[in-house]
UniProtKB/Swiss-Prot annotation:
Cofactor: Mg(2+)
Protein name, UniProt field: Endonuclease V
Any GO BP: DNA repair
Annotated EC: 3.1.21.7
Signal peptide positions (record): none
Species, as recorded: Escherichia coli O139:H28 (strain E24377A / ETEC)
Amino acid sequence: MDLASLRAQQIELASSVIREDRLDKDPPDLIAGADVGFEQGGEVTRAAMVLLKYPSLELVEYKVARIATTMPYIPGFLSFREYPALLAAWEMLSQKPDLVFVDGHGISHPRRLGVASHFGLMVDVPTIGVAKKRLCGKFEPLSSEPGALAPLMDKGEQLAWVWRSKARCNPLFIATGHRVSVDSALAWVQRCMKGYRLPEPTRWADAVASERPAFVRYTANQP
């Protein structure tokens, strides 16, 4: 594995990421959520993509793609491992969203190219990174109150907002993916909350990918 070449690709791709608002439709009609996991000891990459109506946040479509994993897990290069399955799930959708929430980092990455940025750039769709753990940068400690907020900074640059979406839960790291500003990324995530730690798009993507009870109940009620 030529990590020097992959690192150079990341730096080059990151230079093309658009960090300002360029939504084709604002407000969007459809928002997608995307989540990636692995099966069979990492040999299979599984990507779930869901479509929700906005502003009702009603689930209208979901797809799950499973493909052979083409790259081992290497910290800092996860997007190269996850992107092929995300693309496969994206191509399965019967209609394309105006905005995509990706479970993972956007520009809040050492080389400013997390999976949300990588995917958004490659398919040219506005994306937001919604990550559960910090990958780089520093932030001031948050209060325990829901709604507590702090910028994630690295080398004098704001990479994300660190936001405690729910009491007694760890904060989310909300970043520009592509074609969405960091402030708008936070605003869109806040508009898509329904009382859980995660916004509805990535909450549903996680539920579909992992066949969690919410998704099992949903499918049981479908005609």
